[in-house]
Amino acid sequence: MTKVTTKFKEIRKAGTAPSLEEAQAFVGGLVETVHLPDDSLLIINEEGKLENLPLNPLATALWHKHFGPTDEIVGNAIHLAKDARGEGWS
């Protein structure tokens, strides 16, 4: 049995947000941006469930923290968050 793993990348440093092409390459397809209540963003593969990508436990935990156990995140994910001073990643 082959173990399939997912990647979770967190970015907090200002000026380091990925380009569209970099985000697409990381998630492996079209990107979907999820706005989280703490003013951060989660970038995921828009068609991840259709492609039967594996569960991403870290991204799913982040989803559950903000929205409860209403969904699961699959495939690679990027979390764009603000740093401790509240500065953004743009």
Regions found by a protein language model. Name each.
Residues M1-S90:
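Short beta-rich binding modules
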